[in-house]
From Swiss-Prot:
GO terms for biological process: translation. GO terms for molecular function: structural constituent of ribosome. GO terms for cellular component: cytosolic small ribosomal subunit. The keyword Ligase does not apply. HAMAP family: Ribosomal_uS2_B (MF_00291_B). It comes from Bartonella henselae (strain ATCC 49882 / DSM 28221 / CCUG 30454 / Houston 1). It holds the Pfam family Ribosomal_S2. InterPro entries: Ribosomal_uS2, Ribosomal_uS2_bac/mit/plastid, Ribosomal_uS2_CS, Ribosomal_uS2_flav_dom_sf. Transmembrane segments: none annotated. This is Small ribosomal subunit protein uS2.
Length: 257
């Protein structure tokens, strides 16, 4: 059993250290900013590394106790990656528009999920007894529901822990989690408010390579938790070749308070 391994070199290669343009920053991110280069804030990866490791351990521990992890990322570049990571690790996801009340009005959401299940059953039987037009309408309804709720169809209840890409875009999800006392792990870019989440991880939340790296690590942490829960042997997920060191940090000016 082992948590997924990663190196600072991998974070650099994925562009995790690149923040937003300096004029688009949130001053609350000052403690997590190493400096700036060409009017771009550079994130302090020396802080990202331990915070990411702690978050991975939390995911593994939560799953090992039988808890459910909800992956949330509805922006275009995160959508497919989020779904793949959740599916690969037997967890749950929201990768289309977050529907208000997805957590705080779970009863209503559950009714919609039951409707989705019913449509699945009807269409699996080739919608016998329905006209062609009625079948098309049923298929459209199912597609719409599946896009919104397919990733949480089997969740059964609200999650025990939420992992979020882009706290600005997913603010409603964060507020609902707060109301229910559900802890939130989130990637916080230099334009985000780190105070909004329980477990902030400073990092680029826009680059596909960075998002892929985060999601892969968290999926593997969840799988480690499943292995621990089942009492199985873990798989050594380290032993990856170091990526070249990005020279950007050598030419970075310190950020002013």
């Amino acid at each position: 059993m082992a948590l997924p391994d990663f190196t600072m070199h991998q974070l650099l290669e994925a562009g995790v250290h690149f923040g937003h343009q300096t004029h688009r920053w949130n001053p609350k991110m000052t403690p997590y900013i190493y400096g700036q280069r060409n009017n771009i804030h550079i994130i302090d990866l020396a802080q990202t590394v331990p915070l990411l490791h702690q978050a991975l351990k939390l995911v593994s521990d939560t799953v090992a106790r039988g808890g459910r992890i909800l992956f949330v990322g509805t922006k275009r570049q995160a959508s497919d990656i989020i779904a793949d990571a959740a599916n690969r690790s037997a967890q749950y996801y929201v990768n289309a528009r977050w529907l208000g009340g997805m957590l705080t009005n779970w009863k209503t959401i559950s009714n919609s999920i039951q409707r989705l299940r019913k449509l699945d059953k009807i269409l699996a039987a080739e919608a016998q007894g329905f006209t062609k037009k009625e079948r098309l309408n049923l298929e459209r309804d199912r597609e719409k529901l599946n896009r919104a709720l397919g990733g949480i169809k089997d969740m059964g209840s609200v999650p025990d822990l939420i992992f979020i890409i882009d706290t600005n875009k997913e603010n409603i999800a964060i507020q609902e989690a707060k109301r229910l006392g559900i802890p939130v792990i989130a990637i916080i870019d230099t334009n985000c408010d780190p105070d909004n989440v329980d477990h902030p991880i400073p990092g680029n939340d826009d680059a596909s390579r960075a998002i892929s790296l985060y999601c892969d690590l968290f999926a593997r942490a969840a799988l480690d938790g499943i292995a621990r829960q089942q009492g199985a042997m873990g798989i050594d997920l380290g032993a990856q070749a170091d990526a070249p060191v990005d020279p950007v940090l050598e030419n970075t000016a310190p950020v002013s308070e």
